[in-house]
Structure formats: C-alpha cells, structure tokens
Amino acid sequence: MLGGIEAGGTKFVCAVGREDGTIIDRIEFPTKMPDETIEKVIQYFSQFSLQAIGIGSFGPVDNDKTSQTYGTITATPKAGWRHYPFLQTVKNEMKIPVGFSTDVNAAALGEFLFGEAKGLDSCLYITIGTGIGAGAIVEGRLLQGLSHPEMGHIYIRRHPDDVYQGKCPYHGDCFEGLASGPAIEARWGKKAADLSDIAQVWELEGYYIAQALAQYILILAPKKIILGGGVMQQKQVFSYIYQYVPKIMNSYLDFSELSDDISDYIVPPRLGSNAGIIGTLVLAHQALQAEAASGEVRS
C-alpha cells in the first residue's frame, strides 16, 4: 500500500492507494503551521502499513535530487513554511521511502499515466487558480533543469483594452499576474465564481491563456495540454481558448490538433480534482522502485 500527500497552500490532501492509481482512503484538512500540519499527516498514515509515500508540494521547492536541500520548500510566502525540510521530515517520521515533487508535477504524472495523456510520451499540465503553475512531461519524464518549470511567470502580450496592472508581486503583468484567480478578482472586483455569466471576463481570460499556450506549444510541442485548477472550473473559458490559439499560431504549425481537433488537444483533466493525489501515489511507487534498485529496500 502506498501513501500520497498533496500539499496545497490552503489545504492538505492525504490518501492511501495502489500503484494503479486506485484511491482506498483519503482525508483533507487545512494547511496550518508546519508542526501542526505534519502531525496530522503522520497520525493519518500511522493507521496503515505503507511501503512508501509520495509528496506533491506547493512551492517553490528544491526539486534537485543532487542538492543538499532536496525536498525543501524554499521562497514561499506561506507563513512558517519558508525553507521547511518537507521531504526529510516525513522520511524521518515514517522511516519508509518518500518521493517528492511539486503539486502540479504530481497532477501531470497522474494525467500522464491514468488520464488524458495516457499512452502518449509527452504532455503539459497547467493549473490556473490562486497561482499558475505547470508540469511538463517530455519523452516520458518530468521536465527538470536548474529548477522545476515556473511557467506561470512568462510574459504575455497584454490585451489592448486591458488597463489592469497585474497581480504578481515579482513581475506585475506576467501570465500569473494577469490571469490567475486573484488577478481576475482584482480586475473585476468579484471572485471568478461570481463572474460566470459575464462573457467579457472569460473572453479576456481565454485570450491570456491562449497567449501562454502558444508559447508552450512552440517550445515544448506537447502531445496533449491539460488545463486544471479553480479558474478552469469555468468551462466557458475553453471556447475562447479554442478560438484564440489557432489565431495566434496563424497556421505556423500545420497540425490538426491546432485546428480541427483542438478540443481534443486542449482539455480539462480526466481525473478531475484527483489528478494530483493520484500523481503522489505514482511518486511513492517511483521512490519504492528506486530504493529497491539501490538494494536498500526494507524486507
């Protein structure tokens, strides 16, 4: 049996399940200070006989396995969690193999193995909510360089009629600064869920998302793009994305996915809100396999 932790800035989801993505049991609770939160995590998992645990965490995180601080949450504004040794703490408490990555990487893994990208060798999972993040899988592996991708902070072309300055405290009018949930609320004076019947809101949102997707397509050329997160619960935004992506690409890449079949290419997650927690079970299984391969697996 495997354990998974989807650690978000507002809530934690913990689950136990199997390597095939089956969830057997799960629990949710608010994200508090680290000691209080991790105590609840350990109490929950102590009920089960687990072989390994996977963590998909809010970030930024140190996701470099060669780093001395691998598995640490780094420059987060979340109170108490800055420089928190998440991976090592769980490992010390549970004394079993622990896999680690970002929450959006976990969601990408879930959709890659069991959801919309099953059977493909590449995909891009983007979450648009309180922030904007992405996990990319290329040739069957999560993309990792100096850091995990920070695709929410690319610059996009501002709509000529949009005078909003942007919400990102680092970059102002980057993708996250213009299209995240807090940006929508700041621009229009209401939360996204309360603006569902105002077409202007979602056309502008679709325009900005399409700007970003065009860049990702040109750079990564993923075989499937999956859009999740709270903002994407407003399904009407997809029609504007489907309208703007081909216009922006302007037939530069001649693939049917970008024209006739675009609604099969840019999709919501098949696993819904379970994509991330299922992905953490994948991370747990990978950690178990890695330890077995190194000859250190416990009997």
Swiss-Prot record:
InterPro entries: ATPase_NBD, Carb_Metab_Reg_Kinase/Isom, ROK, ROK_cs. ATP binds at T130, P182, G230, V231, M232, Q233, Q234. It catalyses: D-fructose + ATP = D-fructose 6-phosphate + ADP + H(+). Pfam families: ROK. Zn(2+) binds at H153, C168, H171, C174. Disulfide bonds: none annotated. GO terms for molecular function: ATP binding; fructokinase activity; metal ion binding. Its EC number is 2.7.1.4. Coiled coil: none annotated. Induction: Up-regulated by konjac glucomannan and by cellobiose and mannobiose, the possible degradation products of glucomannan. Repressed by glucose via the carbon catabolite repression system. Also repressed by GmuR. Keywords: ATP-binding, Carbohydrate metabolism, Kinase, Magnesium, Metal-binding, Nucleotide-binding, Polysaccharide degradation, Transferase, Zinc. Its cofactor is Mg(2+). SUPFAM superfamilies: Actin-like ATPase domain. GO terms for biological process: polysaccharide catabolic process. Belongs to the ROK (NagC/XylR) family. Seems to be involved in the degradation of glucomannan. This is Putative fructokinase. It comes from Bacillus subtilis (strain 168). The lineage of its organism: Bacteria, Bacillati, Bacillota, Bacilli, Bacillales.
